[in-house]
Amino acid sequence: MRSPSAAWLLGAAILLAASLSCSGTIQGTNRSSKGRSLIGKVDGTSHVTGKGVTVETVFSVDEFSASVLTGKLTTVFLPIVYTIVFVVGLPSNGMALWVFLFRTKKKHPAVIYMANLALADLLSVIWFPLKIAYHIHGNNWIYGEALCNVLIGFFYGNMYCSILFMTCLSVQRYWVIVNPMGHSRKKANIAIGISLAIWLLILLVTIPLYVVKQTIFIPALNITTCHDVLPEQLLVGDMFNYFLSLAIGVFLFPAFLTASAYVLMIRMLRSSAMDENSEKKRKRAIKLIVTVLAMYLICFTPSNLLLVVHYFLIKSQGQSHVYALYIVALCLSTLNSCIDPFVYYFVSHDFRDHAKNALLCRSVRTVKQMQVSLTSKKHSRKSSSYSSSSTTVKTSY
């Protein structure tokens, strides 16, 4: 199985490169300085705007934060990873969504969940050029407050959307094994209802990201950051409670459901008698389990754990020593947009066929003609075999 292994290798390479970048950043700063997180401290100085001299609330950052904002970790490494995710994720998820919507006739629950997962990835990836440009230009945001809020909202919304839809997909696969004779139309209606509920939930839980002011001007660096620097009071108060609630409610609980579903699935597969066809299904189910667990370990677990640790250190100590690892983990979480199409490949046999036909530029009409031709050939072989056996029987008497 290549996709999980490739994901592990890519994740390991990214972590190695990130650790080197982080060490270089830390060595270039004063180790005795405090406030090792991107906390914006109020600096009540006046600055000249286009309409004259006005006094506004501006912010300053400590030496470590300045080194992170100007270092290669954020200005070189992050845009490289985001570029890879954009180049791979945009066409693969676009094709996946097209296959699910226009090529797949039977809308099973798994197809519905995977289509929503592809849509979530696509809605996140299309904003990546702005994020890439932001980091390349020294973490300087020039696109306005509204676009910054949209970018951050879609960034976190995609991560938690992916977690919830992967959980639904995992539970659904277990339910198919336990109850294979269920009514497909009823299941599809339930899946549509659950998908709509997930989108509504994500919209509601990401509202604070759209409301809170995400851009802050740093006069000392002459840059405007997008989400990288926030006021200290906001970080230790509302943002801590907000991200802690997200980590528990939208990551930890779904992760528990996913793990439970796969443990029960493995038990069911081991206890049931296996013929040749069932053995193939069992192997495909195991591939799905390994792929999903790899996604959780590489993409979701580090970012959510470090997110809680980062904000806890800010709240308890007024500083965070893990910010560099935290932003690398957030960067790794975007790899799910590249891995998800491989999950579709393992889960759905129809998706594999439709994707191959799409890549070979075969129209729906051409595929139907090929299927009819193949069916007629099989039927003719069976007929010739039957007539041959009948002739043999007659001559033996």
UniProtKB/Swiss-Prot annotation:
Predominant subcellular localization, coarse grouping: membrane
Subunit structure: Interacts with TLR4, COPS5 and TMED2. Interacts with GNAQ, GNA11, GNA12, GNA13 and GNA14.
A family per Pfam: 7tm_1
Family: Belongs to the G-protein coupled receptor 1 family.
Signal sequence residues: 1-25
InterPro entries tied to this protein: GPCR_Rhodpsn (IPR000276), GPCR_Rhodpsn_7TM (IPR017452), Pro_rcpt_2 (IPR002281), Protea_act_rcpt (IPR003912)
Protein name per Swiss-Prot or TrEMBL: Proteinase-activated receptor 2
